[in-house]
């Protein structure tokens, strides 16, 4: 029988994001639901899981304290992963703009220097967890949405760069890399701003996490953008984009709800889709990754996909196994 497991070793290491199971901080709170989700993801062929930083008792796998409470310790949890078909947790995604009961805030802002100490403290909690389970990286989404902060000033960009450098310094002491994630609503909008940010974060331990759908929705050509920044792209989130924000509705108040959830003026029913169903040129991107010798993690996502979540995982698994992985072994994957 053919091995259905998707490789997590080699030049491209495949994994899956756990965030699609939990839509809202109070949802998907039962421990047994989370364990079933790990089993379903493994059954789909993905044996590595990127966790998302969470908060409170409603998120059993969102904090190391919660994990220790449920499993006795972080190490016991890591040792038990194989029982559910999961080989490893390579990293955690951390958005300081989300509320945290443990740190006592309703969202912090990386452009505000007064928030830096607490963001750094919170990042350290998750970085130490990643190190303890044998992972490799922390992904941070540092920029606030445009509708909250407006145009990104040079001073604000410098503040974010200083915070990233501080977090990267802490993470490197644990043997981890730090990857910067940009989303469709981010106050950082242009390639020139990315250039400026990277110039202020020169450490080899700092890289970009390219989210194919988020960047496409924001109006970027992901393949061209990857070619421009390939030396610093160290991580990918693979998901498809079903539309582009051509009306610049990222400026709308509460754009997370007004645009992403409600669809904006065009009433887009769904922004994110399974691989191969939308606007992202995955074949062209894989060709560029092959040509430019990308080595690192590719984490597939089902962000806000339809219920049941398992169907998106299986469709993405099919696309990876039958379309993308065969292209990895061709001299010209785009052909």
Predicted segment positions?
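N-terminal pre-domain/capping segments
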Residues: 1-136, 165, 207, 287, ...
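Conserved beta-strand positions in the central sheet of alpha/beta enzyme cores
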Residues: 50, 90, 139, 179, ...
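Histidine-acidic metal/acid-base catalytic patches
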Residues: 1-45, 128, 191-206, 210, ...
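Active-site-proximal loop/turn and secondary-structure-junction residues that shape catalytic pockets
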Residues: 20-22, 53-55, 94-98, 142-146, ...
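Active-site groove signature of glycoside hydrolases
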Residues: 129-151, 174-183, 299-300
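Active-site cleft segment of glycoside hydrolase catalytic domains centered on the general acid/base Glu
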Residues: 145-164
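Basic- and aromatic-lined ligand-binding clefts that recognize polyanionic substrates
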Residues: 173-202
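Histidine/acidic residue-rich metal-binding segments in metalloenzymes
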Residues: 161-169, 201
């Amino acid at each position: 029988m053919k091995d259905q497991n998707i490789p997590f070793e080699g030049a491209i290491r495949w994994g899956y994001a756990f965030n699609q199971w939990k839509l809202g901080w109070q949802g998907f709170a039962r421990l047994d639901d989370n364990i079933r989700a790990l089993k379903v993801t493994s059954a789909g062929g993905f044996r590595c899981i990127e966790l998302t930083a969470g908060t409170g008792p409603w998120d059993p796998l969102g904090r190391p304290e919660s994990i220790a409470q449920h499993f006795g310790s972080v190490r016991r949890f890591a040792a038990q992963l194989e029982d559910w078909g999961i080989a490893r947790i390579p990293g955690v995604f951390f958005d300081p703009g989300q509320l945290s009961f443990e740190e006592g805030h309703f969202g912090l802002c990386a452009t505000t220097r007064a928030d830096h100490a607490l963001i750094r403290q919170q990042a350290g909690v998750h970085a130490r967890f990643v190190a303890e389970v044998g992972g490799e990286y922390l992904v941070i989404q540092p920029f606030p949405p445009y509708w909250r902060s407006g145009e990104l000033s040079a001073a604000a960009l410098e503040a974010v760069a200083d915070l990233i450098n501080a977090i990267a310094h802490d993470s490197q002491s644990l043997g981890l890399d730090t990857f910067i994630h940009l989303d469709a609503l981010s106050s950082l909008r242009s390639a020139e701003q990315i250039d400026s940010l990277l110039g202020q974060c020169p450490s080899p331990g700092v890289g970009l996490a390219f989210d194919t759908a988020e960047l496409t929705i924001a109006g970027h050509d992901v393949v061209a953008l990857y070619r421009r920044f390939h030396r610093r792209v160290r991580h990918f989130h693979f998901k498809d984009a079903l539309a582009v924000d051509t009306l610049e509705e990222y400026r709308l108040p509460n754009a997370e709800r007004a645009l992403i959830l409600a669809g904006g003026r065009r009433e887009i029913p769904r922004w994110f889709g399974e691989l191969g169903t939308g606007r992202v040129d995955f074949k062209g991107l894989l060709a560029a990754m092959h040509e430019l010798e990308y080595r690192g993690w590719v984490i597939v996502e089902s962000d806000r996909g339809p219920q049941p979540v398992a169907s998106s995982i299986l469709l993405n698994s099919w696309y990876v196994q039958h379309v993308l992985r065969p292209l990895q072994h061709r001299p010209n994957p785009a052909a």
